[in-house]
């Protein structure tokens, strides 16, 4: 009875923390979506869909520290299991986490392959005023059916794809791999779900390489460099207006005597008049920003922004160094591409892999660090998306602007962030493989010692950090790790993706260093949906 009560207490602690994270996530998603959605084109359904899909992704990531916490707290620091942690209780705890993953991953599949596409196509059809609601729903369902078919194919392939590994590899290593995956289960339903989620994670990896890697270098450098002075930009703009007005006056003077203008002059006049309208619109925006209290407040916070920029670039360098050492470890010590570069433990230590187990001894510091890492990925991804925009090959589909993002763009944004957040679980594993696999678990090993006072040798049990050499019944592997490595070919793709991530980060760092300061109205003159009577994207 006492054993059951202690186990329940441990579960309550873990899930209470998860509940607090859940509330924080919902609040963050609401603020985040409301900040970027268009004030003029705000739609209730698209807003709720965006908030819900982003929240589901973040909640799934929040399961990672819960998973690690539960497997770690089943054991004492001396390597022994706690009194309540017998085989049945341990299995019950592991199944609880597994069912949590089942539920959340199923909801993610529903969002990605049905709900988000349906809402997106519904609003695409809504732009046509002549279309009835019934027709809009039918058309949206017709297009969504294609996504449902893709999901069904992924589930079928995942359920029956062979997982046989090459026979020319070390048999001991593969026995260990097989025994680990047997813990996760061998049902076709689980394999289908794992394959589908891994496919989405692979797309998330491509999004992370495109947006997160660039944003990780662009965000801190933009904070450090700041923006150009509104007063100086306004002075330059005034000079440009005077110059364009002189050109217009010169061209118009040619027709004072009643002679018609040549075709070339007409084209030039039209271009100058269009340029003048743009410059006057910029003048209004710059005047508003120069006189706003928000600009003065941001100017007072300039030193703080520089400090944050330096902090973010140091964090980025910490991540890059940890990721490089982890990938180098796999390149040197894993079984190769046919095994998905799976490696047990860490032969080359990296800063984060050493830091996280230490923080876990002081609850809940590791939760805080994992949350910071996930939020850092979110903010840098958003910075990358804002700088690059949403593209389909060479065609720019949408721009993300504060207070001016259309419902369709908002759905695209949350879809990309959902996929990136899915990939963060593997990124965290890449940064701290030992922590994600075993947490802070220890196990006991027998060591022979020789004593001068007593003849012969004696045996002493000493704790050791859990690794691949530990007996199967002494260390519990997290469910997260098993989900991530169910299919070796995805692990191989993630490995090469990490190298691409490092390369894009370095390229982005060079590009961001070479770029000058941004305009205070960056992107305003590009936005076709800005009316002349609206002062600025920063007016909110």
UniProtKB/Swiss-Prot annotation:
One of its GO terms (biological process) is gastrulation. A motif (WTKF motif) lies at residues 294-297. It is a multi-pass membrane protein. Residues 32-50, 122-144, 210-305, 386-408, 508-540 are cytoplasmic. Signal peptide: none annotated. The modification Phosphoserine is found at residues 528, 531. A motif (YERL motif) lies at residues 232-235. GO terms for molecular function: AP-2 adaptor complex binding; clathrin heavy chain binding; cobalamin binding; insulin receptor binding; protein transporter activity. N-glycosylated. The modification Phosphothreonine is found at residue 238. InterPro entries: LMBD1_LysCbl_Transport, LMBR1-like_membr_prot. Keywords: Cell membrane, Cobalamin, Cobalt, Cytoplasmic vesicle, Developmental protein, Endocytosis, Endoplasmic reticulum, Gastrulation, Glycoprotein, Host-virus interaction, Lysosome, Membrane, Phosphoprotein, Transmembrane, Transmembrane helix, Transport. One of its GO terms (cellular component) is lysosomal membrane. Glycans are attached at residues 78, 88, 170, 347, 448, 457. Residues 1-10, 72-100, 166-188, 327-364, 430-486 are extracellular. Isoform 3 is expressed in liver. The chain crosses the membrane at residues 11-31, 51-71, 101-121, 145-165, 189-209, 306-326, 365-385, 409-429, 487-507. It is found in: Endoplasmic reticulum membrane; Lysosome membrane; Cell membrane; Cytoplasmic vesicle, Clathrin-coated vesicle. It is linked to Methylmalonic aciduria and homocystinuria, cblF type: An autosomal recessive disorder of cobalamin metabolism characterized by decreased levels of the coenzymes adenosylcobalamin (AdoCbl) and methylcobalamin (MeCbl). It is due to accumulation of free cobalamin in lysosomes, thus hindering its conversion to cofactors. Clinical features include developmental delay, stomatitis, glossitis, seizures and methylmalonic aciduria responsive to vitamin B12. Interacts with ABCD4; this interaction induces the translocation of ABCD4 from the endoplasmic reticulum to the lysosome. Interacts with ABCD4 and MMACHC; this interaction ensures the transport of cobalamin from the lysosome to the cytoplasm. Interacts with INSR, adapter protein complex 2 and clathrin heavy chain. Lysosomal membrane chaperone required to export cobalamin (vitamin B12) from the lysosome to the cytosol, allowing its conversion to cofactors. Targets ABCD4 transporter from the endoplasmic reticulum to the lysosome. Then forms a complex with lysosomal ABCD4 and cytoplasmic MMACHC to transport cobalamin across the lysosomal membrane. Acts as an adapter protein which plays an important role in mediating and regulating the internalization of the insulin receptor (INSR). Involved in clathrin-mediated endocytosis of INSR via its interaction with adapter protein complex 2. Belongs to the LIMR family. LMBRD1 subfamily. This is Lysosomal cobalamin transport escort protein LMBD1. It comes from Homo sapiens (Human). The gene is LMBRD1.
């Amino acid at each position: 009875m006492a054993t059951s009560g202690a186990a329940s207490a441990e579960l309550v602690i873990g899930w209470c923390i998860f509940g607090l994270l859940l509330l924080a996530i919902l609040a963050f998603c609401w603020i985040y979506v409301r900040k970027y959605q268009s004030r003029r084109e705000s739609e209730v359904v698209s807003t709720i869909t965006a908030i819900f899909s982003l929240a589901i992704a973040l909640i799934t990531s929040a399961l990672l520290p819960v998973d690690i916490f539960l497997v770690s707290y089943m054991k004492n620091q001396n390597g022994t299991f706690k009194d309540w942690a017998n085989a049945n209780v341990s299995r019950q705890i592991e199944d609880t986490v597994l069912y949590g993953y089942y539920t959340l991953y199923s909801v993610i599949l529903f969002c990605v392959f049905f709900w988000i596409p349906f809402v997106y196509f519904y609003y695409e059809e809504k732009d046509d005023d002549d279309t009835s609601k019934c027709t809009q729903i039918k058309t949206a369902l017709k297009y969504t059916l294609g996504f449902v078919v893709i999901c069904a194919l992924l589930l079928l392939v995942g359920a029956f794809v062979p997982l046989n590994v090459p026979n020319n590899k070390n048999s001991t290593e593969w026995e260990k791999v097989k025994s680990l995956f047997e813990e996760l289960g061998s049902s076709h339903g689980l394999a289908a779900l794992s394959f589908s989620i891994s496919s989405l994670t692979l797309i998330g990896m491509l999004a992370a390489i495109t947006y997160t890697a660039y944003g990780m270098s662009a965000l801190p450098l933009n904070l450090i460099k700041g923006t150009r002075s509104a007063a100086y930009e306004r002075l330059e703009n005034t000079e440009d207006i005077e110059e364009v007005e002189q050109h217009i006056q010169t061209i118009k003077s040619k027709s004072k005597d009643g002679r018609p203008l040549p075709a070339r002059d007409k084209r030039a006049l039209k271009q100058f008049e269009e340029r003048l309208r743009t410059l006057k619109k910029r003048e209004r925006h710059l005047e508003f920003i120069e006189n706003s209290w928000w600009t003065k407040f941001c100017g007072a916070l300039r030193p703080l922004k520089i400090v944050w920029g330096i902090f973010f670039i140091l964090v980025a360098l910490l991540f890059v160094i940890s990721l490089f050492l982890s990938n180098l470890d796999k390149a040197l010590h894993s079984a190769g591409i046919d095994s998905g570069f799976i490696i047990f433990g860490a032969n080359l230590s990296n800063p984060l892999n050493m830091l996280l187990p230490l923080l876990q001894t002081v609850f809940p510091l590791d939760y805080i660090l994992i949350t910071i890492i996930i939020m850092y990925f979110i903010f840098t991804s958003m910075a990358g998306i804002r700088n690059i925009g949403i593209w389909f090959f060479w065609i720019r589909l949408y721009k993300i602007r504060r207070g001016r993002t259309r419902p369709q763009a908002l759905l695209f944004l949350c879809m990309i962030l959902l996929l990136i957040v899915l990939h963060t679980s593997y990124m965290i594993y890449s940064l701290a493989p030992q922590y994600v696999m075993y947490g802070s678990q220890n196990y006991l090993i027998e060591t022979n010692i020789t004593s001068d006072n007593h003849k012969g040798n004696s045996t002493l049990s000493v704790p050791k950090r859990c690794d691949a050499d530990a007996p199967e019944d002494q260390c519990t592997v997290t469910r997260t790790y098993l989900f991530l490595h169910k299919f070796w070919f995805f692990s191989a793709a993630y490995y090469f993706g990490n190298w691409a991530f490092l390369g894009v980060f370095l390229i982005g760092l060079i590009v961001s260093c070479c770029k000058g300061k941004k305009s205070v109205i960056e992107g305003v003159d590009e936005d076709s949906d800005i009316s002349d009577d609206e002062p600025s994207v920063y007016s909110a």
